[in-house]
């Protein structure tokens, strides 16, 4: 695809250079889907490849499953494809949840908080085989959009795979509306109820999420 031949934007270079110089993690957030409405998985792959080309070694993906713009049970294949792709790079799938939680746009903050707590505090169902966990959700009548937060558990330090202050965060959704709430509580302001606190992050988005 031509997407892999494009030169990274200056703002992306600056973020990757910052991460490299300060030994910080880079986190990729977004809808892992080939639906092309809010995001496209090819963009995530390009970002991972580019970060690796910069010599970055601490790359983490926080995946949101679709189920609305594509087949409601296509997430297992999408995630399996992503896992196979990142085997060639210093990247790991850290967490996963349905877009119902991560991409709410109607101020239902209790949903956003479940995604926030997952990627910041590691609160979710533990899994050592996330594709199997997704398929178990299907068996229980839960499709991609509604998959409960999952933290991918392995032998590595859990905290390092979560979003920490001073890290780089790249939200790769390119449509404005459904990335807004999670971006706001991660990087712009504190919310009292339910409690979510903004963090000190180098936060990048694919477009402006503000009105």
Q: Each PLM stretch: what is its role?
A:
Residues 2-4:
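Short, small-residue-biased leader/transition segments that mark boundaries at the very start
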Residues 21-26, 55-59, 89-91, 165-167, ...:
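Short coil/turn connectors at secondary-structure junctions
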Residues 22-50, 54-81:
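Active-site histidine-anchored catalytic micro-motif
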Residues 25-34, 60-62, 115, 168-175, ...:
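Beta-strand elements within well-structured catalytic alpha/beta cores of enzymes
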Residues 63-70, 97-103, 201-211:
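Short connector loops at secondary-structure junctions
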Residues 70, 74-157, 162-164, 177-182, ...:
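Long, well-ordered, tryptophan-enriched scaffold segments
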Residues 168-169, 174-176, 182-184, 196-211:
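A cross-family signal for N-terminal binding/gating loops and helix N-caps
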